[in-house]
Amino acid sequence: MNAPYSYREASYTPVPASWRWWPLATREAAQLFRSRWGILLYGLCLIPFLVRSVILMIVFGVLNLGPESLRTRLQTRPIAAGGPNAELDPRRVGFYAAQALEPPAFVFILLLTSMVVARAIARDRATNALELYWTRSISPAQYVLAKWVGGTLLVGSITVFAPFVLWLLAVFLAPDWTLLQTTAGGMAMLLGGLVLATGMLTAIGIFVSGAAATANGAIVVWTTILVGGGAIAELLAAVLRLPELRSWIAPWTAFGVVVRSIAGLNARGASMLGAWCCLGTLLLWSFWRARKRLRIEDALA
């Protein structure tokens, strides 16, 4: 002990790299819950899950809501595969995929990724927080990895964990174990596809954030990619009468096509090759734009 200054001696103890970047990842995943507005936003993103939960309980007779004829039909007869209402039948894997892939889910995923993923690095740069490179002794690659893991955990709680919880609820509400036996394999493939596609989507968002000068600019670019790409794809598909163009141009459509193709679900009018090319091209482009701005020299500038 140094008496005049009351300093304590400390010895250098090396720690694994994961011990240095993992706290940053968990902090990023919990960032949204640090304000009331963030908690409200996350609650809004759970609306598709809550709606599907109500449908699930109606089908299995826990709730008596809606017209009696509809309840009877849902409870007694599985909906024909490929029919207009096939994704309302919890005895099919498509019911759980729709919770994360249908158009209403897009609005909430867009909000969530815009406020968290697309701002992750740009927000740190605006507050000079890239000094984490030397205060936590992490490399730029580890910093980006931490941001990606944190963002993926948060978005994945909606796109992956929520469908899984919904399926578990259906398994325990079902009168026997038939639902488990008939959907377990399909659900495993669906969850794998959701994990892969969610990871790619959040990686693109993280790189967009890394390339942007400001957090607001990152949100604008990210929204333009998802919404603008979808609008252009819809226009060209209608004019040229080529519905598969949506898979090549619209990132959200490509997200759904990748998941459905891995899960073995119906993806009519879609191109799996186009979907992979769309997401892969965006991933490479955003990485190329971000790589120079994430160097240590940039953090010192």
State where each predicted segment sits.
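Short, membrane-interfacial amphipathic segments enriched in basic
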Residues: M1-A25
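Terminal transmembrane helical anchor/hairpin motif
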Residues: N2, S11, I58-Y96, N216-I296, ...
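Secretory targeting signals
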Residues: E9-Y12, T72, D89-A105, L145-I206, ...
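Membrane-interface helix starts
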Residues: A17-W19, T26-L44
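Hydrophobic alpha-helical transmembrane segments of multi-pass membrane transport/permease proteins
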Residues: R36-L63, V107-S114, W222-I232
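Long, hydrophobic alpha-helical segments
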Residues: Y96-R123
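Hydrophobic/aromatic residues in alpha-helical transmembrane segments
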Residues: L110-V117, V165, A203-F207, S286, ...
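Helix-loop-helix units of permease transmembrane domains in multi-pass membrane transporters
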Residues: A120-T152
